[in-house]
Amino acid sequence: MHIPPPYRSKEEYVHAIFSSIAHRYDWLNTALSFNRDKYWRRFAAAQTGLQPGGCGLDVCCGTGMLTIELARLAGPGGRVIGLDFCEKMLLKGRENVSKTPYSGQIQFVQGNAVDLPFPDNTFDCATIGFALRNVPDIRKTISEMARVVRPGGKVVSLELSKPSLPVFKQLYYFYFNHLVPLLGRLGVGFDGPYSYLPNSLKDFPHQQEIKELFRETGLADARYYELTGGIVTVHVGTVT
């Protein structure tokens, strides 16, 4: 991926992008996905198998919307940690959580997906939503998520993917490559962040390759579910 100046790394570039759009991120996600993002997050959370009283981790949690879904499953006796490296996204996440019944069971932590600040076998599950494209090292991120999950627990990724259905694929890529950057520019008031979105998907591995990465990092029963015609894919693996 081309990193524009003055940024020196993908990590620095991604941090700047999400800092600039945190205030409009949730609204634009819902608008650009035609309100499907809520269903996608709920489906991904359900794949974790998180039970009432359980403990979950949401990596690259952003504004906390998937974190909230995990807290809903964990219930009043559970605990969920949302981790992100972007301060402004975490601030928005705290604001979002304060409007839910789950503020007492969610904690936000600033940290990096490739070096999670938790001991081995800490959580019952770990999720990452719409962020595996953005990390500097996909394999390391999956490996870190697996490390902090207890044996038998699930690692789940919800991510944009590459649809393959004829005709639908062409329509989708026209929308994604041309209209999303335009609508994003109108939504945030400046160019850049939503032009990054289609570029990030071009460089991202196909869903079958991500499944293989899950296997190579030691996750058992690695599988994936394509949703909404393959616009997004949920990958699931079990820690052994």
Positions of the model-derived regions?
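Class I SAM-dependent methyltransferase SAM/SAH-binding core
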Residues: 55-115
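C-terminal alpha-helical "lid/dimerization" subdomain adjacent to the S-adenosyl-L-methionine
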Residues: 12-13, 158-213, 217, 223
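A short acidic, Gly/Pro-enriched loop at the edge of an enzyme's catalytic core
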Residues: 114-125
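Hydrophobic beta-strand segment of the Class I
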Residues: 25, 126-127
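A short glycine-rich, Lys/Arg-flanked "PGG" loop and its adjoining helix->strand segment in the class I
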Residues: 139-151
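Core SAM-dependent methyltransferase catalytic element
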Residues: 217-240
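Short glycine-dipeptide loop
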Residues: 52-53, 76-77, 149-154
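Conserved alpha-helix/loop element of class I SAM-dependent methyltransferases that forms part
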Residues: 34-54, 69
